[in-house]
């Protein structure tokens, strides 16, 4: 493989453990309309999908309330839910390790809350490009975001790698022809599997062990 020149990160489940925030945020939408809290299937869904699809899914049994549910979720202050998020402990160390040798980007199905997270956790300086669901016509798993990132840096898919944790991420990377590092998900079909960021520094993709001249 050619030299690694680009590392692209998913946000939820990779940069942050955000299930707690998603749980409280979407349960608040359900509670507001007098409905029971989400089950595990619904929690898994909202953890992987962007906010519009997520609200559509959790309110699928009450279609007459859907428009009101979207209006209500837009009125919620996401800062109230940040306290339920945990940054991966070695994320910053890994970012400092790979920059400036590798270009860095984010591809996420978050929307407006991504900028808030980057600012609150002082991460914006580490990422050269951020693609959210509102920046593309086709959110993940469609490859649009990754293809636009590659085009921005004038790189080929084999020169980059994507770090994700879900089936949506697996399909996203595969559709773009990019290698995948599965983060804390040993069941995901991927080129590599890790449980922490600094483990990545020892992978062949980082050490040059998989490089061909």
Residue ranges and their predicted role:
Residues 1-5, 96, 111, 115-213:
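Asp-based, Mg2+/Mn2+-dependent phosphohydrolase catalytic module
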Residues 107-108:
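Conserved phosphate-coupling serine/threonine residues in phosphotransfer and NTP-handling enzymes
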Residues 2-100:
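N-terminal helical cap/lid subdomain that shapes the substrate entry/recognition surface
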